[in-house]
From Swiss-Prot:
Gene: hutI
Subcellular compartments: Cytoplasm
Binding site residues for N-formimidoyl-L-glutamate: 137, 303, 305
TM spans (from-to): none
One GO cellular component, as annotated: cytoplasm
Biological source species: Nocardia farcinica (strain IFM 10152)
Residues where Zn(2+) binds: 70, 72, 227, 301
Protein name listed in UniProt: Imidazolonepropionase
Free-text comment on the cofactor: Binds 1 zinc or iron ion per subunit.
Biological or metabolic pathway of the protein: Amino-acid degradation; L-histidine degradation into L-glutamate; N-formimidoyl-L-glutamate from L-histidine: step 3/3
Pfam families, per the entry: Amidohydro_1
InterPro entries assigned: Amidohydro-rel, HutI, Metal-dep_hydrolase_composite, Metal_Hydrolase
Record flagged with keyword Zinc: yes
UniProt binding sites for 4-imidazolone-5-propanoate: 79, 137, 164, 230, 306
Residues involved in Fe(3+) binding: 70, 72, 227, 301
Amino acid sequence: MPTTALTGIGQLVTNDPALGEGPLGLRRDAAIVFEDGVVAWVGDSAHVPATDTAHDLDGRAVLPGFVESHSHLVFAGDRAEEFAARMSGRPYGAGGIRTTIEATRAATDEQLGANVRRLLDESLRAGSTTVECKSGYGQSVEHELRSVRVAGRYTDEVTLLAAHVPPPEYAGRVDDYVAMACAEMIPRCAPHAKWIDVFCEQGAFDRDQAHAVLTAGIAHGLVPRVHGNQLHRGPGVQLAVEVGAASVDHVTYIDDADIEALAHSDTVATLLPGADFCTRNSYPDARALLDAGVTVALGADCNPGTSYTTSLPFCIALAVRELRMTPDEAVWAATAGGARALRRGDVGVLTPGARADALALDAPSHLHLAYRPGVPLISRVWREGTLAYATN
């Protein structure tokens, strides 16, 4: 098989302490070899084995490709006017998730697919090489089915967000919607998805309703995820731990009992600071979670209403500035942490046998991601060993 070497790496983030310094497994003056889509060798530039091709990175930092474990990409339209109203403190009665449900239902499959492809290309340019993609803007059997099918054209990490908000036709009949989702939607959509998700929050679905949807998904072979504790202290975190969810996302309003439950579970706390930034919400207490030993991931939460960004570098900068994470913690959370949230061991790391997903910065160190917010530092991206994006 053809082999490719990246040499002259000023700083290599492996995320394997056995390969370098600290939790990020940092190596200096390093090299890495890709073969047949995976990492074949990691070591010093001075000792790199012979390869078919080699690229000198001239002192740039190299990291694992970012792992985006939370995105809502299957939608139509935008909510820019709603955003402007929110920022100016004006009421905007036409806004909300239901606006996007209406636009998404009206769009063709081709239009939805083009939007997913556009946003995935944007994510790639920002360094994301693995992207989870949710449905959730259909909220009917027909429209959720086509949403997961559209998502499945572009990613293996498809989530059926079967309970986002009750659609207009189920106003005042949330239990009826849940019964429909469990009896009809989930059985039809499960063959096209990997994950089942719910929005467990006041104004959306309560604990019992969310539990019913998650257990129905589990019965059809889907692995649970939970949107929880975004707007209020509620049952989302405890429910996620109870059902063995891979991740509970947002976790903005939590207490000591929630932190303790997460610390004694395999459920990852996925923080989405872009949503808090764009809504002027409080930020989650990342420091308390990390200090308690909770596994933390970072996601961009790309969606048209509350976080219309695909940039994990931006979220890393927010995490360091607003969530009081260290630069090392934030980079780990956006790479290995995201992989943990997707229960993946082959991405988010640059170790022999891992998938050859990597990015190079126009900077000598990963610290520059938080140090230089808003600067487009991603200069090259490799996916499965193939150069997928380059600035020049």
